[in-house]
Amino acid sequence: MILDELLAIPADATTATIQGVEMQIISADQADNMLEADTNDEKTHECILKNGRFLFESENGELKALYKVHI
């Protein structure tokens, strides 16, 4: 499950691979723009966890992109 895999990423990690997808580091502005562009919450999803703020994109239940927001 994606949530468990995200929680396993160390808070200070700058690299990680989940389900074969490499995590990319993005700015808070980039994250906000991505979320604003997906007004129906169909493509980009956000998880704010104890180890960071993550955005991910999935299609048909398959992870396509993973982002960690740099603070």
Can you describe what each PLM-predicted range is?
Residues 8-10:
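Long, charged/polar, surface-exposed segments that mediate recognition or autoinhibition
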Residues 15-71:
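Acidic, low-complexity, intrinsically disordered interaction modules
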